[in-house]
Amino acid sequence: MSLPKLADHPTATAGNPQDVAIQSLDPSSNETSSMEPSHSEKVHIESDVEESMEARIERLGRERPPIFKSLWAELGFIFSVLMSQILTEYFVSGFNLILPTLIEDLDIPQASSVWPATAFSLVIAATLLVFGRLGDMYGGYPVYLLGLAWLVGLGPAAFLPTGVMLIGTVYRPGPRKNLVFALYGTFAVIGFYFGIFCAGLVGQYIRWGWYFWIGAFLAFITLITSAIFVPNDYKERRKNAITMDWPGAGATVCGIVLVVFAITESAHTPQGWRTPYIPTLFCVGCILLLIAVYIEGWVAEMPLLPGDIFTTPCMTQLTVALLLLYGNCGIYLLYGTLYFQNIMGATPLQVVAWFTPVAVGGIVLNILQAYLLHLVPGHFLLIVAGAGAVGSPLLLALVPAGGSYWAWVFPSCVLTTMSIDLSYTVICVFLTTQLPSARQGLAGGLINSVMQLGMALALGLSDIIQSYTVDEAGLRKSYQNTFWFAVATGSACSILMVIWGRKVGKAASDLTADEKLELEREAARLSSSSRAETGGN
C-alpha cells in the first residue's frame, strides 16, 4: 500500500495519526482553493475522506499482493509455505506412532524411549530464534530453502519462522491474510493426520524406513516449488543492516538444551536428581540462560529477542499461554498414542482412525476462522481454545478401564483440535500484525520457538511423572497421571487467555505496523513544525 502524501497542515496533531492522513486529503488544505469551506462542509468532506480511506484499506486487505503477477504465482507461494506445516507435523505426529516399532527394531531401552520424540522439539525450540534472526538478516527466501534442503531437526527450525515471516511480510492486515494463516493452520492439521496415516501404514505393513523416505520426497517437492514461487527478498533484507548476536545465541541454545536434557534424563538415571551430572547440567544450563538474558538485555546491540517486543499489549501473557498450550498438546499426542496402543490395544491403523476427528475438526475450524476472524473478537476464540485445552486431557485422565472410544476418546479429540487450531491462527495473526516487517522473522521465531519449547519441557516433566509412578500405580495409571499434568497446564493457559486475551480483538483490515509508525512520525513532525511556527510568530 502506498500511503497518501502527507501535506503540511497546521491543524494536524500527533495525538491521532489517522487524522494526519485524512487532513492531507482535505481539499481545504489546497493553496489554490479560492474559497474556504464552511464548518459544515469541512465535517462532510472529512467524513467522506475518512470513509474512502477505510474503504481503501478494506479493499487492499482483500486484494492479491502486488508482488504476485498472477493468481498462479500466489497459489504457488501459498502451497510452498503451507508445505512447511505439513512437513513439520508429519514428523511430529507420525514419529509418535511409529516410535513403538522403532524402539523394538532398534532395541532402544525403555529409559531412552522418550528421547526420539523429545529431541525433535528440543532442537527446533533451541535454534528457532537463531534462524528467525537469519531470516531477518538475509531474507526469508534463502533461509527457507536452506531448511528444506537440510537436516530433519534443524530444517524445521529454519523454515518454520521464515514461513510465518514470509506470510506476515507479503500480506497486509485483512481478510486475505486471515485466510492464508487459516490455511496455514489447516495444513498443520492435514500434516498431522497425513503423518500418522503414513506411519500407521508403514508400521503395520512395510519397514519403518519408508516413513522417512516419504518425508524426504515431500521436502524435495517443496524445495522445487519454493525456489520457483517464493519471492527472493535477500537484497531488501540486507538493506536493514541487521546483525546476529552470536554470544547471546550460543548461550541461549546451550542453556535450553542442557536444562531440557537434565529434566528429561532425570527420570531414567539410577538415582534421579541425586545422580551427579543431572543437577550439574541443570545448573550450568540455568547459568547459561541467565548469561543470555544479561547479554540480550544489556550487552547486545541487536538482541535476538528485544525486550521492547513485550511492550506490546498482553504479549508476555500470550507467550506464556502459548507455551502452556503446546505443552498440553505434546502430552496429549505422545501419551495419548501410547495409551491407545498399550492400554486400549489399538493397532497403528486404528490409532489413525481414532485421530480422524482431529483432522476433520481442524480443517473445519480453520476454514471457519478464515471468514470469522475479522468479525469475531479473538478473545472469544482464545477462551474456547482454553476450554478445549482443559477438557481434552481431562477425559483421558478419567477414562475407566475398558472405556469406549466414542464415550471418551472421540470427544477428547474434538476438544484438542479446538484448543490448538483456534489459538494458533489467532495468535499468529495478532503477533505478525503488531510487529513491523523488519521483525517478521522474530515473530515467526518467537511463535514457533515457544510452541516447540512448550512441547519439549512438558514431555520432559511428564516423563518424570510417568516414570516415578509406573512401579506403584501401574502403566495405565502412570499414563493418566501425565494427563492430569496436562489438565493443570491447560487450566493455567485458560486463566491467562481469559484475563489477558481481552486485548486481542477482531482481525479486520488495517494499516500495517510500518504504515502506522510512518504516520506517527509524520504527525510528530507536523506537530513540531506547528509549534515552531507559533513560537516564531
Stretches with model-predicted labels:
Residues 110-111, 174-184, 348-349, 435-447:
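Loop-to-transmembrane helix entry/capping segments in MFS-fold secondary transporters
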Residues 102-103, 134-135, 198-206, 263, ...:
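Interfacial helix-cap and linker-helix signal at transmembrane-aqueous boundaries
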Residues 128-130, 134-247:
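Helix-loop-helix hairpins in multi-pass membrane proteins, especially solute transporters
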Residues 2-90, 104, 527-534:
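Cytosolic juxtamembrane N-terminal segment immediately preceding the first transmembrane helix
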Residues 434-471:
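A late C-terminal transmembrane helix in Major Facilitator Superfamily
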Residues 206-320:
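Hydrophobic transmembrane-helix bundles of small-molecule transporters
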Residues 118-133, 160-164, 356-369:
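Central cavity-lining transmembrane alpha-helices of secondary-active solute carriers
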Residues 79-83, 90, 95-100, 107, ...:
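Transmembrane core module of solute transporters
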